[in-house]
């Protein structure tokens, strides 16, 4: 039950990241059309930047579980089974701690943006806490994914990162 929920969360996060990329495409096309017709679309570059940050953070957890992140597989493959296990525990432990630390400070930063009514410096004056919300959501999902992999590794001895065979190179 929880496994299906977590896998669904990671997949939904990846889909949301893809939708953010589509939003960027539409923003660029609309901005081009506006320029050709002599109109102005204020804030379009800012919105594209917010969508790019959202796409990046929302994609992290999905990319982690698909094996798309750069890993130190050359080193891990050279180690024995026991040393590899401890190295993976160490890496997931550090990654989990850093992800939760980052999440906490994004939460604090967003709290300050709300408290001080922080707005963007562009023409549109977008409230920054709105632009920071997808970044916070993505960092929470990444921290959950790293915690999930760490706990799975400690309990079963194997992490849940599955790399697609077509994406790997011959070793």
Regions from the language model: what does each represent?
Residues 1-171:
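Alpha-helical transmembrane segments and membrane-interface helix-loop junctions
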